[in-house]
Amino acid sequence: EDLFLGFDDHAYEAAFEEVRKGAQRFQTFRDQLVPQISEELFLSIITEYEHYTRILSRLFGFSQLAFAADTQDQAAQAQVARVTQFYAEIDNQTMFFSLWWKALDNENAERLLKASGDFHYWLVAMRNFKAFTLSEAEEKIINIKDVTGVNALNMLYESITNRYLFKVEIDGELKELTRGEVTALVREPDPDLRERAYQALFKVYEGDAPILGKIYQAIVRD
């Protein structure tokens, strides 16, 4: 399915509204999530979940692609921040389902898994995080914190490093390359070219070592 024509595309704004309405509908299922839930109702609930999360993923993917194409584009930066915030808000509104599913007893979980069809792998993977899941209130706080914490730091890092240009000698000619282009060279079969590519990367990154180091430390400590 295509993404969007641009940030001014009517379909782009309409997608936000469709996700909002989908999340609102999904919240009406909360009281129906009981251990003895029928397979039919369970499938209808996760199908509804899939519908609006697919649209949300399109929004997220489109904003990220626009940002990756030009990390200095302020419109793209603003939309990445907007979609990231929106994603966290929707996730907080519908988090109750994943928490319920992780906490469900094994017998009923197995019963529902047998009827889950294409959702089977996703549901199994979700339960693998049971031991690392906090309370709903705590998980919501982490979601909100990440918007202005690690996610913002990652975007700052990308904005800084994607501006870099690297000088590498190729076939006797000194060429100026982008980060993506020079990164591709580190997988070339020619060992000398790989070495020059790595040296070019390290030389440029070293120039911003203090600020990049601070970003790394902040992400690790977050």
What are these regions (language model features)?
Residues 1-222:
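A well-structured
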